[in-house]
């Protein structure tokens, strides 16, 4: 199997998001990379499922709360930007203050 660099990056992000999800389910508080990976992976999957950019921007702010992350992580993440694949092409999605 030959993957482009972009496809490899998407797979790595998906795997990191899955690892973060499992840690969250075990009751662990997520660190910065885990929080970003989980939110990004969730947004990419929701885009693939057909949600709009606006829906993703709203959904991205509901995935994690301050109680889900280590102290100070929420203050470190001001925005998350991903390029997501939608049924009509690739678009940039920005979620401001994703952890509330």
Swiss-Prot record:
Q: Keyword Hydrolase: yes or no? A: yes
Instruction: Provide the alphabetized UniProt keywords.
Output: Cytoplasm, Hydrolase
- Tell me which InterPro entries the record gives: Urease_gamma (IPR012010), Urease_gamma/gamma-beta_su (IPR002026), Urease_gamma_sf (IPR036463), Urease_subunit (IPR050069)
Identify the domain of life.
Bacteria
Supply the enzyme class, top level.
Answer: hydrolase
Q: Which reaction does it catalyse?
A: urea + 2 H2O + H(+) = hydrogencarbonate + 2 NH4(+)
Primary location recorded for the protein, binned into one broad class: cytoplasm
Query: In Gene Ontology terms, what is one molecular function of this protein?
Result: nickel cation binding
Spans through the membrane: none
Give the EC number(s) listed in the UniProt record.
3.5.1.5
> Under which pathway is this protein filed?
Nitrogen metabolism; urea degradation; CO(2) and NH(3) from urea (urease route): step 1/1
Q: Name one GO biological process term.
A: urea catabolic process
**GO cellular component annotations of the record:** cytoplasm
Q: Where in the cell is it found?
A: Cytoplasm
Q: Which family does it belong to?
A: Belongs to the urease gamma subunit family.
Subunit comment for this entry?
Answer: Heterotrimer of UreA (gamma), UreB (beta) and UreC (alpha) subunits. Three heterotrimers associate to form the active enzyme.
Query: What is this protein identified as?
Result: Urease subunit gamma
State the organism of origin: Acetivibrio thermocellus (strain ATCC 27405 / DSM 1237 / JCM 9322 / NBRC 103400 / NCIMB 10682 / NRRL B-4536 / VPI 7372) (Clostridium thermocellum)
């Amino acid at each position: 199997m030959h993957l482009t660099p972009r496809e490899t990056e998407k797979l790595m992000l998906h795997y990191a998001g899955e690892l973060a999800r499992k840690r969250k389910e075990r009751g662990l508080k997520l660190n910065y990379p885990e929080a970003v990976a989980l939110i990004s992976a969730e947004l990419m999957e929701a885009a693939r499922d057909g949600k709009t950019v606006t829906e993703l921007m709203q959904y991205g702010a509901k995935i994690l709360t301050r109680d889900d992350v280590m102290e100070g992580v929420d203050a470190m993440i001001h925005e998350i930007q991903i390029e997501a694949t939608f049924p009509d092409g690739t678009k940039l999605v920005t979620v401001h203050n994703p952890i509330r």
